[in-house]
Structure formats: C-alpha cells, structure tokens
C-alpha cells in the first residue's frame, strides 16, 4: 500500500513553480523523489527557484521558463519537455 501513492521516479511539471503554491508543490514532489520541471513567465525567478529547491531538497529540478497563458508558450514548454523525457506522469 505504501508504494500505491509513491511519486518516486515520476516526472512532474509544475506551472507557476517559481513561487507561492507552485513552489511548495514542486518542493513536495522533490522531497518525495520526483524529477520536477518548473515553469513560470519570469526566467530569472524560475532559474533561481530551481537552484534553491535542489539545494534544499536534492533531486533534480529543471527550470523551463514559459508563458503558458499563450499558445506559443505552451508549445515551447511541451517541446522542451519532450526533448528531455519520454513520458510525463504529473502536470500541475
């Protein structure tokens, strides 16, 4: 039963992951063994948050800045993840 809800080894994208609730969700995923991609419109904030989360929780957190309120941003984010991963397990 313990492994039923495990996210260890899962691949997650957290949009709005550079601050607030998104950052907290990303931190929780990292702390529980997921590989996390965070996205936000502000490149510097996204990169700084990814670095800080890795320092604090370990694991792998990748910054993929994108404006997902625009179709171009969504397309860019999907392409960036598809280049790196063969699957996606969690989308927030």
Spans of features found by a protein language model:
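Flexible N-terminal pre-Rossmann segment of NAD(P)-dependent oxidoreductases
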Residues: 1-13
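Aromatic pocket-lining residues of Rossmann-like dinucleotide-binding sites
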Residues: 29
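Conserved glycine-rich cofactor-binding loop
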Residues: 11, 18-20
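Conserved glycine-rich Rossmann-like NAD(P)H-binding loop of the short-chain dehydrogenase/reductase
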Residues: 32-49
